[in-house]
Each structure stands twice: as structure tokens, then as C-alpha cells.
Amino acid sequence: MKKLSVCLLTAVLSCWCAAAFGWGKVGHDAIAYIAECNLTPKAKKNIERYLGGRSIVYYASWMDQVRHTPAYKHTTTWHTNSVDAEGNYVPDPKGDAMTFLDDCIAKVKDYRNQDDSTVRVSIRFIVHLVGDMHCPGHVKYPWYKKYKFSLNGAEYNLHNYWDEWALTLSNKWHYLEYGHQLDRCSKREKREIAQGTPRDWLADSARDCRVIYDWTKADQKLSYEAVSYTHLTLPTTS
């Protein structure tokens, strides 16, 4: 596998995270699908060789599925990133998405000196982590845990809401439909979005995701109109 394959994979994944903006399985599948559609044939072939011929979409939520198993329990904290009040990255001593993503990228780039299983698992992690680091509920500001709200009588915290319900309660699309609706950038726009490093993308994500604390106040009671409002005001790639 050429280094270009992993660089291209992480770059194209970053392009489509802001468009989905609330994850769960459908969101992760949509991000991976759109990214896959923008891979070069050579990069796609190289990646799928390590994945046993499977699509990256197949493994988009794999990291969520294995986090509760004994072998991967140590990855529980590796889905989120903490930032300070100004949105600056604060590394977690227990590990976080950014530290783990950097490690996975380094291993895939060094594929000649890694066994196939290490490269394979690292690719699976990259596909998931680039999505996680762009999700509003996975950017942890200092006041992160204080935010709980009720929506039509059901209580949510922001992590739970943006992980699953932001998509489930708005458009009930399949990941292919998200691909058709959101994969509309020009080549120039794609290049601009994919510029920088994962740490740059985290800084952008922290800045863009802070708005959720303006939309939803702690202990606020909301109706489903709020779901429609957040959906209509989300950034798009069109």
C-alpha cells in the first residue's frame, strides 16, 4: 500500500464529516460511503486488499461494536477529544481519538514494517475515528457533562443526542441517500476541505461544534421543532 492511500483515505473522510454532523451507525456509514466514492481506484484496491475485499463502509462502526469486548475495552476513551474553553486540544492521559488516530496513521504509512493484521485493524480504526472527531458530541468542552435536556419528555445528554438521535429524528435516510444528497462538492472545494492535518481538522471541528451549546441550554425542554431547526441550520457541502 502506498502512503498516498492512507493520506487520501483520511483526507476524503474529513471532507464529509461536517455534512453528516450527527452520527450513529447511519452517520458513520454515510461518511465512509462518500469517502469511498472519492478514493482513487488504486487507493480503494489497496485498502480493500487489507480488509479482505470488504468496503470501508462495512467497518465504519466496527470500533463501536468491539469497544465493549475484553480485547478492546481499553479503547473506550479513544472516541472523543477534550478541548479547553477556547477550543484548544487537551490530550487525555488515558488516550483519545487524536492520539490514537495519529498512531494508526503512522502504522499504516509504515505498512512495510507492520504485519497485515496491524494494518488491517488500523484502517478500521481510521475510518471510524475521523468521523468521531468531527461529531459535536465527541468534542468535549469543560462544561460538556453539565448539558442535559429533554425532548418531548425524553431526557438526553448532548453526546447521546448527537451520536444517534440528530439523524434518527430528522431525515430517516439510508446512508446511500446521504451520499446522494451530500456528495456535491467541486474538486476545488474537496481539495480545500481536505487541506491540513488531523489536528487542524480537530481545531476546525471544535470551533464549528461549539454552536450546539447555543442551540441547546442545560435542562432546557424542547419540542421536535428544535430537531428541524438544527437540521436546517447545519453546514452543508453543497
Task: Please place each PLM-identified region on the residue numbering.
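Acidic/His-rich structured neighborhood in mature extracellular/periplasmic domains
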Residues: 69-165
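Bacterial N-terminal signal peptides that target proteins for export
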Residues: 1-8
